Amino acid sequence: MKKNILLLSFLCNFSLLLSAQTNVEKGLQSINRSSAEATINFLASDELQGREAGFHGSRVTSEYIASLLQWMGVSPLADSYFQPFDAYRKERQKKGRLEVHPDSIVKLKQEVHQKLSMRNVLGMIPGKNTKEYVIVGAHFDHLGIDPALDGDQIYNGADDNASGVSAVLQIARAFLASGQQPERNVIFAFWDGEEKGLLGSKYFVQTCPFLSQIKGYLNFDMIGRNNKPQQPKQVVYFYTAAHPVFEDWLKEDIRKYGLQLEPDYRAWENPIGGSDNGSFAKVGIPIIWYHTDEHPDYHQPSDHADRLNWDKVVEITKASFLNMWKMA
């Protein structure tokens, strides 16, 4: 009898503990290392052939991401999870640089030297206010294969940017795990063609019918390495200078939730380039960008998953979920 009473007491206390959790804490608790490892190890595997935009590995990656969104219960932004687009290179253009110009496609086709078909992956959790949007995104493409190299020829891109993709997926799941509908529509964006000139995010911005209703964009690009070995918790936190509250949010959440991060806060007056956040900043949309800086394996075949700081990936994902919770 005493044993049964103790068991009943334990179960009651456990139930009270769960019910005492806030919605945001439920979401935060769902973010974990094993999920990050599963996503990154798959995306950075040799089977995906370096995920070059317009080629087989990138196509498989987009299918994988869409299937996970569907499995989680995240709705497609439109009729499909995919936003297809074509990128063109003119005959005399610089090698590796392509363009997306949906308004001048006929003229481009007359001058085209090469065409690559790409597609973004876009999911959404509807908000209470259906007229406003916030976006969290990361590019999923990388550099593919270079047969001219000796030895390892596959650019696996574990940090760049399988790490960012894992964060966006975990944030989507965290919003669902919270059990609370966001105030604004939250779009989960996975960009194709970033390595060829931010093509996917540029296309989205150029064709978006609700661009003026987007209230903020959070970007991930390379969030898993230690640029400074003596500072394993360091992360660069770029944000739009006109929105100093973005810095206040992160400082508050580090204190409140004990996040193991040491941010290098960088407020930017001018639009920030270098990654997909630039496409949004150029049209006046406030941005946040998490980045752990370049390292010796940047854009090298040696950018492998076994070199990542997994604790940092998880802590940045948690911090950015809290950012998005406030932004939404």
Q: Model-found features: residue ranges?
A:
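Acidic/His- and Gly-rich active-site-bordering loop/insert found
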Residues: L43, L69, E111-P147
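Metal-dependent peptidase/peptidase-like ectodomains
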Residues: W191-T292
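A non-catalytic alpha/beta surface segment that caps or lines the substrate-entry region
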Residues: R51-M124
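His/Asp/Glu-rich mid-to-C-terminal helical/loop segments that flank catalytic regions of hydrolases
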Residues: P296-A328
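Bacterial Sec-dependent N-terminal signal peptides
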Residues: M1-V24
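Alpha-helical metal-binding/catalytic segments enriched in His/Glu/Asp
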Residues: V121-G123, V136-H142, D146-G197, S320
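Second-shell loop/turn segments in exported
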Residues: N23-S30, D46-H56, L108-V112, L149-N161, ...
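N-terminal hydrophobic or amphipathic helices/low-complexity stretches enriched
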Residues: L18-P76, I125-P126
